[in-house]
């Protein structure tokens, strides 16, 4: 999934919009394909909503997942052999009518990674990615998130820290407009050109 050198750049605009909403601010500059004329005004980019609905073509989901840094789909699939068990099957990730839900969950106290109960502490917010009704474990891709969580959730603050570096990693201008030779198959594993 991450083998196309502009994959991360294609989805980074949506990633920036989601993060701006989570941080409750508009976007005056993005360094990507965002129309900041719309995203810089709360009239056209509303904030503090309990529900946002964004629509796109289902094939954009792969770029969006790459832009968010989800690496569990980055296994190199060789054209010469059957891969066996693997995490990326196009028909599962982007079927017709594919859906990506990003949920923010608030708990009265931190929730144990094994979901065995609450821990001591204050109210905690978590982010939960659901792709076609299946949880995407965020800890598999982001060291800031707890890989041991059985629910795949990530504490919201840890998730936001992980996401802060994603626009820079996308290298939007270079990926989309840079002059580079097409990389050999298997050399791009993170959605950006070498």
Regions found by a protein language model. Name each.
Residues 1-194:
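Non-catalytic terminal regions with compositionally biased, polar/charged low complexity
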């Amino acid at each position: 999934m991450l083998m196309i050198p502009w994959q991360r750049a294609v989805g980074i605009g949506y990633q920036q919009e989601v993060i701006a909403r989570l941080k409750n601010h508009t976007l005056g500059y993005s360094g990507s394909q965002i129309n900041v004329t719309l995203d810089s005004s709360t009239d056209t980019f509303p904030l503090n909503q309990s529900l946002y609905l964004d629509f796109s073509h289902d094939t954009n989901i792969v770029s969006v997942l790459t832009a968010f840094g989800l690496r569990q789909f980055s296994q190199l699939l060789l054209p010469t052999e059957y891969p066996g068990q693997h995490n990326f099957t196009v028909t599962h990730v982007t079927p017709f009518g594919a859906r990506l839900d990003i949920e923010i969950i608030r708990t009265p106290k931190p929730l144990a990674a094994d979901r065995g109960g609450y821990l001591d502490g204050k109210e905690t917010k978590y982010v939960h990615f659901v792709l076609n009704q299946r949880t995407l474990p965020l800890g598999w891709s982001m060291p800031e998130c707890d890989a041991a969580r059985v629910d795949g959730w990530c504490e919201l603050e840890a998730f936001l820290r992980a996401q802060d570096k994603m626009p820079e990693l996308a290298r939007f201008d270079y990926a989309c407009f840079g002059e580079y030779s097409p990389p050999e198959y298997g050399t791009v594993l993170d959605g950006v050109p070498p």
